[in-house]
């Protein structure tokens, strides 16, 4: 756990530096310099590329995490494991490329009526997909080598800095829209190159394929698992459907969703680091048949994620009003408050229970993943098609939340019945009760105290003073409650509680 903690902390620092840069960019640059349609365009381009890249992986990322323990051998550079991880994604990219050209005209027709900007730049999707694909593959290779901090910095910080530069260049009229979109997409090319160079500096990878080590039995096992897990990438990417379907109704809706989604996605940030560094450890425990360790790690990750996600959701929610009052053109995006709530709940559920997906994928029962992912994907698509016309931008967030519920209930049931693995504990119930109590107290604040602040005026100063007092008071209450609850030794240490 020492390595996990060390890399998680470094990764978390990169994540939150990226959040700071992203927050400044999103709330004070993008909303000021770009129209809602232009914001929606960048969102749809990235989401579509990430979805295509996920499918093009052909399950490679899951295979890296599952099979690396079998290949691990420092003396032979892991039997050329890195070289193997480059082949399947390239095959997948070729397949996606062929399908893209076959259905290109259909995609253009789908968006031409309400989102013609997408049609103008659809040609950039393939190169953007390629770089998004290998950026992720290189990042996963770094993860199994327990060197996740630098790739996290690249994903969370470097890309955001490069995007910020492109926003400023376009916003101040230094480049045209065409050049801006190319620069925006090029940030992923730079990130891919940096990740590759970093892997090479580790001195632990080799392009030489060890054909003698990979016998027919192992090759068959890897290929079957990899192809089976192709659909599994959709589990972590169902939110990508939201902007893609919203764009059908117009890029303006996708732009509103982008701003709200950025706020809600803060909730998932801790898991990006903790999940990436704990997954290889859990994979090793599953390979060793040490289910007691799997249970311990799974509950530990799940409990900590529930705590952090719940607190983040609460403090984001109570500060939404002041946030939209501060950002440029905030009145144009305030309709996204419902998205923040429902997508925030979806992110809380996913970050708390997502480790269950990894446990199943690493086990001998991974074949069930195809069933669950198919259920999740079908639910997400159908719910988006049904709810967006009825509830607009909030319907897309509700579709994600409901789809996750449909997905995790049978998944957790299977884990318990087949592996006797459970992610739940009494401490998690305490966290839920604390969160509900805080939301209830916030409701009382809105009813009794907010009118008193309104009597003092409606200016920005009054809004900020109330927000600071509310956040400070509830922060003190939350910390005091957590000190009494003793959620875990790690939480107690952070809160400076002596055992």
Model-derived segments and spans:
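Transmembrane helical elements of multi-pass membrane transporters/channels
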Residues: 7-23, 159, 183-199, 216-284, ...
């Amino acid at each position: 756990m020492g390595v996990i903690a060390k890399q998680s902390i470094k990764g978390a620092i990169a994540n939150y530096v990226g959040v700071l840069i992203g927050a400044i960019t999103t709330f004070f640059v993008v909303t000021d310099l770009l129209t809602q349609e232009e914001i929606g365009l960048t969102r749809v381009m990235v989401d579509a590329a990430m979805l295509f890249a996920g499918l093009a992986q052909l399950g490679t990322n899951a295979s890296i995490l599952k099979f690396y323990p079998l290949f691990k051998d420092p003396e032979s550079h892991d039997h050329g494991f890195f070289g193997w991880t480059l082949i399947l994604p390239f095959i997948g990219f070729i397949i996606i490329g062929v399908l893209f050209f076959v259905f290109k005209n259909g995609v253009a027709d789908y968006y031409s009526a309400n989102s013609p900007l997408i049609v103008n730049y659809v040609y950039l999707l393939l190169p953007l997909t390629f770089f998004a694909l290998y950026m992720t593959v290189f990042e996963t290779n770094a993860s199994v080598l327990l060197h996740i901090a630098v790739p996290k910095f690249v994903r969370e910080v470097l890309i955001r800095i490069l995007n910020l530069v492109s926003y400023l260049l376009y916003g101040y009229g230094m480049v045209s829209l065409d050049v801006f979109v190319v620069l925006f997409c090029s940030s992923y090319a730079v990130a891919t190159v940096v990740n590759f160079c970093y892997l090479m500096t580790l001195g632990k990878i080799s392009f030489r394929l060890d054909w003698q080590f990979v016998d027919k039995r192992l090759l068959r096992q890897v290929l079957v698992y990899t192809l089976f897990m192709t659909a599994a990438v959709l589990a972590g990417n169902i939110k990508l459907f939201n902007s893609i379907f919203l764009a059908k109704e117009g890029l303006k809706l996708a732009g509103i969703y982008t701003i709200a989604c950025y706020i809600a996605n803060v909730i998932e940030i801790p898991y990006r680091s903790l999940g990436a560094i704990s997954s290889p450890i859990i994979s090793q425990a599953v390979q060793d048949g040490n289910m007691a360790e799997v249970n311990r790690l799974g509950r530990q990750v799940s409990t900590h994620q529930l705590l952090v996600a719940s607190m983040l959701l609460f403090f984001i929610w109570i500060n939404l009003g002041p946030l939209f009052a501060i950002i440029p053109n905030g009145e144009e995006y305030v309709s996204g408050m419902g998205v923040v709530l429902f997508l925030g709940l979806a992110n809380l559920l996913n970050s708390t229970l997502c480790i269950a997906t990894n446990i199943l994928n690493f086990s001998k029962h991974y074949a069930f993943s195809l069933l669950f992912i198919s259920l999740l994907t079908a639910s997400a698509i159908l719910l988006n098609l049904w709810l967006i016309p009825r509830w607009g931008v909030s319907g897309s967030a509700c579709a994600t939340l409901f789809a996750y519920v449909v997905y995790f209930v049978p998944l957790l049931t299977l884990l318990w019945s087949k592996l006797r693995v459970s992610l739940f504990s009494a401490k998690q119930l305490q966290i839920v009760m604390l969160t509900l109590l805080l939301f209830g107290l916030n409701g009382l604040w809105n009813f009794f105290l907010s009118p008193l602040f309104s009597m003092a005026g409606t200016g920005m100063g009054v809004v900020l003073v109330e927000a600071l007092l509310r956040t400070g008071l509830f922060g003190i209450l939350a910390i005091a409650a957590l000190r009494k609850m003793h959620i875990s030794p790690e939480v107690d240490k952070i809160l400076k509680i002596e055992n």
